[in-house]
Amino acid sequence: MPVLFSSRSLILSIIVPLLISIALYKLDTFDPAIVPSDAFTSSATSLPPLINDEFLTGAEFIGVGLLNIPEDIAYHKESNLIYTGCVDGWVKRVKVADSVNDSVVEDWVNTGGRPLGIAFGIHGEVIVADVHKGLLNISGDGKKTELLTDEADGVKFKLTDAVTVADNGVLYFTDASYKYTLNQLSLDMLEGKPFGRLLSFDPTTRVTKVLLKDLYFANGITISPDQTHLIFCETPMKRCSKYYISEERVEVFTQSLPGYPDNIRYDGDGHYWIALPSGVTTLWNISLKYPFLRKLTAMVAKYGVDLMFMENAGVLQVDLDGNPIAYYHDPKLSHIATCDKIGKYLYCGSLSQSHILRLDLLKYPAQNKKL
């Protein structure tokens, strides 16, 4: 009899939780989509000829403890200041120096939100893509903050992400997702549906236009040196695309990246630098193919357990045609959000750290690993 009771208890201990799990799965309204086949390009990933796979070996840390998750950075050459937005709402200014110990961090303006993308307007103003507020204009050396726009076509921005400024003053920016907020970022990725938009704001007419919609987490953006097109990143698709401004058409700029792109910067010297918060992971590749796995992951994420691990972050350098030139990464590195080449240094913002990373490209260059 005790044996029978023990066997029955064992069966119940397995069946009951299983039935409960099935019921919870069925009742959960999260409905991930089948991801387009061009997302499955990991096997076709081609690495550039030059590689530095020990990024952290030469990395220096700027503003340790004074910069609370500095996601994006923008360099103002005339003042030798880096502007960066932090998770506590502060746009901070960092005086850069040859020695990281001589760098000075200043609390400049608090937006009352979460500043992400940062760029400079044609009149010296600072343009901020604030994830909670919308597109902001900070002028008068920080004395005036103005909301430029927070909606388009009657749809409020949920995740104002990155911004770039054309020579004629027009602002181009991304709303990564009109459905999910920054804190729900993983749910946007897991659902596998295109909620992102590419937009423009004309300061003269005050008109906000939707240039493209149905993008997969529209992230970083920059304008080409000849001002003819934009380059924007779609993170889960591992690609960056061109949008021709006058022709209003799109084509792939670079794809099959070795990681998931965040921000992109032009260095003024014929190259773009693409930040990769994480390298390609096997778990994510498998999840992309099977919506039910993404639903399970999302259900777990709602209880505060994030299974979307980020690892082997880095920076990819490409030429004006999108051809990979050099790849700087490290298996121990994660959450690189942006990168800006300033002189001989590469400066990187982060999605998780309390500092800006700096790498001396002359001392720690990418090298030909095939030699």
Curated annotation (Swiss-Prot):
Positions carrying Phosphotyrosine: Y303
Keyword NAD: no
Pfam family membership, one: SSL_N
Induction: By salicylic acid (SA), jasmonic acid (MJ), ethylene (ET), wounding, and infection with the fungal pathogen A.brassicicola and cucumber mosaic virus (CMV), both in local and systemic tissues.
Name of the featured protein: Protein STRICTOSIDINE SYNTHASE-LIKE 7
Native species: Arabidopsis thaliana
Sugar attachment sites: N101, N137, N285
Gene Ontology cellular component terms for the protein in this record: vacuole
Main localization category: other
PANTHER family for this protein: ADIPOCYTE PLASMA MEMBRANE-ASSOCIATED PROTEIN HEMOMUCIN-RELATED, STRICTOSIDINE SYNTHASE-RELATED
Residues annotated as signal peptide: 1-25
